[in-house]
């Protein structure tokens, strides 16, 4: 996962301040996985979590990925001296604030959803919690 086109090739590191204001509530599915701490999540981690989710659900139900890795992270090659500019873009990450919903699922029962999202959470570098839509 990475953007098709970006305005700039390299980006500043930046910091993750505050809590998520947008993307903090369930928008599509019945169950979700919500971040409880700030961290950068890579495209590979998101993909690994998605695979764990879909495998456990046995292709039943529907999955929504609510984060997208749009920040390039640059890296210098191994054993290269400091200086000579910034390294080339190596991977793509998504900045995740606390309270952000990462994944949403629907079409499965509560127990299956909880198990699937727990498996997905194990693939991510952040603490998360299971959230459920309250019936109105």
From Swiss-Prot:
Ribonucleoprotein recorded as keyword: yes
Disulfide bonds: none
Keywords for the protein's UniProt record, in alphabetical order: Ribonucleoprotein, Ribosomal protein, RNA-binding, rRNA-binding, tRNA-binding
Any one Pfam family match given in the protein's UniProt record, by short name: Ribosomal_L16
GO-annotated cellular components: cytosolic large ribosomal subunit
UniProt-listed CDD domains: Ribosomal_L16_L10e
Membrane-spanning residues: none
GO terms for biological process, alphabetical: translation
Subunit structure: Part of the 50S ribosomal subunit.
Family of the protein in this entry: Belongs to the universal ribosomal protein uL16 family.
Protein name, as recorded: Large ribosomal subunit protein uL16
């Amino acid at each position: 996962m990475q953007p098709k086109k970006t305005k700039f090739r390299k980006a500043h590191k930046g910091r993750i301040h505050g809590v998520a204001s947008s993307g903090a509530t369930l928008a599509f599915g019945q169950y979700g996985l919500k971040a409880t701490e700030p961290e950068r999540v890579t495209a590979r981690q998101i993909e690994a979590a998605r695979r764990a989710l879909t495998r456990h659900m046995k292709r039943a139900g529907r999955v929504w990925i609510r984060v997208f890795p749009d920040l390039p992270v640059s890296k210098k090659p191994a054993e290269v001296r400091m200086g000579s500019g910034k390294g080339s873009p190596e991977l793509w990450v998504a900045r995740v604030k606390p309270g952000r919903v990462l994944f949403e699922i629907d079409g499965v029962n509560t127990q299956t959803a909880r198990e699937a999202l727990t498996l997905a959470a194990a693939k991510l570098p952040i603490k998360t919690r299971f959230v459920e839509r309250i019936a109105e």
